[in-house]
Design a protein with these regions (language model features):
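N-terminal secretory signal peptides
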Residues: 1-18, 31
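Twin-arginine (Tat) signal peptide motif
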Residues: 14-23, 42-45
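Short acidic/histidine-rich active-site segments
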Residues: 285-286, 308-331
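Sec-dependent signal peptide hydrophobic core
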Residues: 26-30
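C-terminal helical cap
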Residues: 294-295, 350-364
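Extended, charged catalytic domains and RNA/DNA-binding interfaces, predominantly
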Residues: 9, 40-285, 289-291, 302-305, ...
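Acidic, glycine-enriched loop/beta-strand segments at the rims
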Residues: 311, 366-369
Length: 369
């Protein structure tokens, strides 16, 4: 979900506008917010920070180019938050379908227009220009090869994994996968809020009834190049098609197990287990769709661990990709609250380290080359 300002910004980038073309204001979404200040014991608060001192951690889905739109804070302030929160790395995502999107009265994003050829690719390219600058400000080294991660961790450097959310920017051209790979992108989320040339989405009725032939070609090309396929926003038939096409494990960067809400962006246990069955990872998502707290988010993580096992769970905050009034995090100073709350809930230190980054390190080193 997104405030109108972010769509205006994406469309402006599609017109080669300045990165300062932010439109002020945010939509009052009909969802409930909550802060993520931990209620963990003082001992576990200290122990949670110690986990982050000793083990690499990563946020698997963020949009730092939108920080100023929502939080009214600068990227320099977020750089200080990264340091204070002991974050080891982050996926920095452009939005591939941004120029097509608008907001329904209920706050739901949808594809409202069909951009002219080249607009979505151009917008994504310019967003990546912005994200490159943000990575430098955040003190992050781009991961381009599998060995880059181990080298950065050994050197106590933070890592940026450049990503695009929504394969719409490919505009049906397989050669664009190679172009963005050469540009430094190492993860593509196949679909977002527009039913595109690759497949259907969770939030609209099916059109293709799964992954398209072009979608299968994109998955295979990403495997060949050494890119991580992200299946967030993809319904079960698309995930099944991607699994059949892929020779490597994949990621669902931000979702939760749907046991009670009926929220379209959550997934069934069968869906989650399919992703995990090939070694994949699912990012637990701290979104508040009802009165929620840090404890509710830990419930989501525990439900996911119970479903797929602790080796297949990570954290994807969607930081600044949704209005901060509907997620449980506003900046990375709150990152240590997650391991603290997990420890307080009875998770062991080794398992907490896996969830915070160890599982994603394994997945990245198995897929990125």
């Amino acid at each position: 979900m997104c405030a109108p300002s972010c769509f205006d910004w994406w469309r402006a980038l599609g017109r080669a506008a300045s990165r300062r073309d932010f439109v002020k204001g945010a939509l009052a979404l009909p969802l409930v917010a909550a802060g993520c200040a931990t209620t963990a014991s003082p001992a576990n608060q200290a122990a949670g920070r110690a986990v982050l001192d000793d083990a690499w951690s990563v946020d698997v889905h963020t949009h730092p180019a939108l920080f100023q739109t929502y939080s009214r804070t600068t990227i320099d302030e977020h750089a200080r938050a990264v340091q204070a929160g002991k974050l080891g790395g982050a996926f920095l995502a452009a939005v591939g379908d941004g120029p097509a999107l608008s907001i329904r009265p209920n706050g739901a994003p949808y594809a409202a227009r069909e951009p002219a050829p080249g607009v979505m690719f151009g917008s994504s390219w310019r967003q990546l220009d912005v994200l490159d600058g943000h990575a430098r400000t955040l003190g992050m080294r781009r991961m381009l090869r599998g060995g880059d991660l181990a080298a950065a961790i050994a050197a106590h450097e933070r890592v940026a994994i450049m990503a695009v959310e929504g394969g719409d920017f490919l505009e049906g051209r397989l050669e664009n996968v190679q172009r963005v790979y050469d540009r430094g992108v190492r993860s593509i989320q196949l679909v977002h809020y527009r039913v595109n040339e690759l497949g259907d989405i969770q939030t609209e009725p099916p059109v293709h009834n799964g992954l398209t032939p072009f979608g299968r070609d994109v998955v295979r090309e990403m495997n060949r190049l050494g890119m991580l396929v992200d299946l967030a926003h993809a319904p079960y038939p698309v995930v099944k098609g991607a699994m059949d096409a892929s020779s490597r494990p994949m990621l669902v960067s931000h979702t939760n197990i749907d046991d009670y809400s009926g929220y379209a962006r959550f997934v069934s246990r069968e869906h989650a287990r399919l992703v995990a069955s090939t070694g994949g990872v699912l990012g637990a998502w701290p979104i508040s769709i009802r009165p929620a707290s840090a404890s509710t988010f830990i419930d989501h993580i525990k439900r996911m661990v119970d479903t797929v096992g602790v080796d297949h769970v990570a954290i994807g905050t969607d930081m600044a990709g949704v209005n901060p009034r509907v997620v449980l995090f506003t900046d990375w100073t709150e990152w240590p609250s997650i391991p603290a709350a997990l420890l307080d809930r009875g998770f062991g230190r080794e398992d907490v380290a896996k969830i915070m980054g160890g599982n994603m390190r394994r997945l990245l080193e198995a897929t990125v080359s």
